[in-house]
Amino acid sequence: MSQVEFEMACASLKQLKGPLSDQEKLLVYSFYKQATQGDCNIPVPPATDVKAKAKWEAWMVNKGMSKMDAMRIYIAKVEELKKNETC
C-alpha cells in the first residue's frame, strides 16, 4: 500500500458513475480525512448544521486510527464501490 495507490483510489472515486448513499459518502469521507489529516482536530459544529455535524461525527469514529490503516480501508472501500457499480 502506498501513497500512489491512495491517490489512485481518490481519483477512481471521482469517476464512479452512480450516486453514493449518504452513508457511503460519510464513510469514505471519514477515512479520507483520517488518512490525510489524522485525528479530528476541529471543534464540534453546531447541531443546527446537520451536514457538518454528520461529517464531524463520522471522522471522530476513526479517532486513534493510524493514517496508514485509514488509507488501506479507504482504498478497499473505493474498490468495493467500483465492484458494486459493475454489478
Swiss-Prot record:
Q: Name one Pfam family in it.
A: ACBP
Describe tissue expression. Testis.
Main site of residence? Answer: cytoplasm
Which residues bind an acyl-CoA per the record?
Answer: Y29, S30, F31, Y32, K33, K55, Y74
List residues of the ACB domain. Answer: 2-87
Key word Cell division present: no
Subcellular localization(s) per the UniProt record: Cytoplasm
| Known role | May be involved in the energy metabolism of the mature sperm.
Q: What is this protein called?
A: Diazepam-binding inhibitor-like 5
Recorded source organism is Rattus norvegicus
Organism lineage string:
Eukaryota, Metazoa, Chordata, Craniata, Vertebrata
